[in-house]
């Protein structure tokens, strides 16, 4: 899962949206650095990552990547799941329009920014203003996201080419998303994530 899905599942679980978004920027034990609700959100994010990576639908989807891009498939798929969530938001969350949810999420996250790591502050400088969570619905933007990650982290250069795997298996990936994401939503609503 990427930013939008983590925020969405956190909302459904009544967990800290701030902690769920912050988690990728925190190493080790967060308990000494953040309040308990944010720590709980960080731990939820980490559980979701492990759960998602081990779902049969996700493991199957990783096999569709070519040998040269399979190593980055988990990262690529995380971004792709956000694409489908953004694209189908009105079906998955009809009572909370995406733009309203984004405003709500941003307000939640802004409360922890003063005490956050610089990389997280930097992310927030463009995540909201450039409307990433809405733009995830466009495949051209997904390609830009993957290229951006590859340029910032040279060892992940294969992300550039992984876009072709997404494009080649788009319909099958969308089917897998519909198989697992509603289940995860139900788990979040029952606080079982």
UniProtKB/Swiss-Prot annotation:
Protein name: Acyl carrier protein phosphodiesterase
Catalytic activity: holo-[ACP] + H2O = apo-[ACP] + (R)-4'-phosphopantetheine + H(+)
Presence of keyword Transport: no
Enzyme Commission code: 3.1.4.14
PANTHER family: ACYL CARRIER PROTEIN PHOSPHODIESTERASE
Top-tier EC class: hydrolase
Organism this protein belongs to: Shigella boydii serotype 18 (strain CDC 3083-94 / BS512)
Family in the record: Belongs to the AcpH family.
GO process annotations (BP): fatty acid biosynthetic process
GO MF term set: [acyl-carrier-protein] phosphodiesterase activity
Domain of life of the native organism: Bacteria
Keyword tags: Fatty acid biosynthesis, Fatty acid metabolism, Hydrolase, Lipid biosynthesis, Lipid metabolism
InterPro entries, sorted: ACP_PD, ACP_phosphodiesterase_gpbac
